[in-house]
From Swiss-Prot:
This is Serine/arginine-rich splicing factor RSZ21A. PANTHER family: SERINE/ARGININE RICH SPLICING FACTOR. The gene is RSZ21A. It comes from Oryza sativa subsp. japonica (Rice). It comes from the Eukaryota. GO terms for molecular function: RNA binding; zinc ion binding.
């Protein structure tokens, strides 16, 4: 079986019209025309050679773009349990297995036994990261201490402001009394 993609279709083209156009090249299994969004279709041929003949003759005709569909190597769209026919292992670059199953990774001690892995993981965890009882998330705090809380009075907090406050005049400032600077005593 071979699936052919037909693009740049007029939205008014019907499956029957496409079937009539492509049937002359060979036996069709199915014709599917997209409606939302319109403008493309898929046609399944029984024989790959018939599909290639149709592509050669119809591509460009009526402004259509006709090509072999990318995932048509098998009845399941060319996919297997590894995602797709082109999936490769991240470790060695070979197809047919995942990185966690790669013999290079396992052989070099990358995975090792599950027992050794879990022990080293628990040893490497920093004591500063503690499980928070709420939501099960980690929170950062120095070991042995809870986060420091500051209680700052509103007047004092105002004096630490980085940006100048323009709404306060000289006479209203707590450091000035009758327009003259008070000395701290």
């Amino acid at each position: 079986m071979a699936r052919v993609y037909v693009g740049n279709l007029d939205p008014r083209v019907t499956a029957r019209e496409l079937e009539d156009e492509f049937r002359v090249f060979g036996v069709l299994r199915s014709v599917w025309v997209a409606r939302k969004p319109p403008g493309f279709a898929f046609i399944d041929f029984d024989d790959r050679r018939d599909a290639q003949d149709a592509i050669r003759d119809i591509d460009g005709k009526n402004g259509w773009r006709v090509e072999l569909s990318r995932n048509a190597s098998s009845g399941r769209g060319g996919r297997d349990r590894y995602g797709s026919s082109e999936s490769k292992c991240y470790e060695c670059g070979e197809t047919g297995h995942f990185a966690r199953e790669c013999r290079l990774r396992i052989g070099s001690g990358g995975l090792g036994s599950g027992r050794r892995r879990s022990r080293s993981r628990s040893r490497s965890r920093s004591p500063r990261y503690r499980r928070s009882p709420s939501y099960g998330r980690r929170s950062y705090s120095p070991a042995g201490r809870s986060p420091r809380r500051r209680s700052v009075s509103p007047a004092r907090a105002r004096s630490y402001s980085r940006s100048p406050q323009y709404n306060r005049g000289r006479d209203e400032s707590p450091a000035y009394d009758n327009g003259y600077r008070r000395s701290r005593s």
